[in-house]
Amino acid sequence: MKSLVLKAAAWLSDLRVAIVLLLLIAACSGLGTAIPQGEPAAFYHERYDAAPWLGVVNGNQLLSWELDHLYTSNWFLLLLAWLGLALLLCSLRRQWPALRASLRWLDYTKPRQLSKLAVATSLDTGDSAAALDQLERQLQQQGWAVRRQQNRLAARRGVIGRVGPLLVHTGLIVFMVGAVVGAFGGQRLERFLAPGRSLELLNPQGDTRLELQLDSFAIQRDPAGRPEQFSSQLLLRDGTGAPAQPAAVSVNHPLRHRGITVYQADWGLAAVTMQLGQSPLLQLPLQTFPELGEQVWGLVLPTRPDGSDPVLLALQSELGPVEVYGADSQQLGLLTVGGESQEILGLPLRIADVMPASGLLIKRDPGVPLVYAGFAITLLGGGLSLIATRQLWAISESGRLHIAGLCNRNLVAFADELPKLGSSAITGAPHDAR
């Protein structure tokens, strides 16, 4: 039984297994990008039953495979746990022992031991003890840690590079933990707010965590009328009775406040202010009409007191114009925002104003600090991994200086430098062993 556990641990800690898992998780994450996430089941049936995804996967299959919430699906979390376990075992079985071994001083006492190392050389010297002293001074000047004994020395440099792989594994594990915490503990809310309206965000106890009030909303358009930027001026209240704090949010410039991030995600039209005949100004809510286009808002308005002869008012921008259609789908007229009234089926209509609405995306993700920390640790570990760890041993014996060394990076360059280092120790000339 013990041997089976050890074999399983050895297989799980294999670097090739971790690489395959990383590629598989990356491919699955691509699926989550291609397939909309978190929509109602009816959305997937409507979209993929008639036209299956990639011509194969219909709505039922997509839902049964949990592709509608891929990042919190059981099989995706299992892949993350598997990768985390593989990295943990690899760190414990390989990286940690390698780090501990690099911190131990190895004492080679005989030249024959040095000759078996990856890089070794032996040089004639008139005074091997003096050459060893000179070599010690050179190594210390170049930043090597040196341990000297009577007729031999050991030196090392760049040991911190051994910490790099361990930090990379730790960072990836922290990153995955943060992703899981965010997937289960995070909250996401999309709302359209009209100016003057507010939205309360409650904590788990039902108390007001944050109140957002839209003070104003502006849409910047290019000469062709296409929206280029839209921004919201908000008032923030934290539920403690403190004065409201003004804040701004726009596209690519989110607002972060007490663990909550507010994005400017969309825009819409909330209401139209109009006059019917000699009536006072009336503010009527608008609704979307997807069957007329992607961004078309409007309302159905009766033109008679008994509710008969309705007309459809449709518009695509807060700037207008407002198109008026009859029950037979024929256009009856165009109304200018802020312009003069026009008679439609005997009823004078005037559009005074159109109120835009701000589409806000509100996220709370408790896993973000862990994700950022994981990225930082991984980057630090990757940088440290580039530092070459070099070890060197030298023994003076019978007029000869025996030098050998090990290096985990660019061994060829180290093999070229080692004889030069020994020669400079013999002649007393300085040599920069990088």
From Swiss-Prot:
Record's keyword annotation contains Thylakoid = yes
A GO BP term here is:
cytochrome complex assembly
Q: Which keywords fit this entry according to its UniProt record?
A: Cytochrome c-type biogenesis, Membrane, Thylakoid, Transmembrane, Transmembrane helix
Q: Which residues cross the membrane?
A: 15-35, 73-93, 163-183
> GO cellular-component terms in the record?
plasma membrane-derived thylakoid membrane
Q: Which residues form the signal peptide?
A: none
**Bilayer topology:** Multi-pass membrane protein
What InterPro entries does the database record attribute to this sequence? Cyt_c_bgen_Ccs1/CcsB/ResB, ResB-like_domain
Q: Does the keyword ATP-binding apply?
A: no
Q: Do you know which Pfam families this protein is assigned to?
A: ResB
User: Where found?
Assistant: Cellular thylakoid membrane
Q: Which family does it belong to?
A: Belongs to the Ccs1/CcsB family.
HAMAP family tied to this protein: CytC_Ccs1
The annotated subunit structure for this chain is:
May interact with CcsA.
Name of the protein in its database record: Cytochrome c biogenesis protein CcsB
Q: Which organism is it from?
A: Synechococcus sp. (strain RCC307)
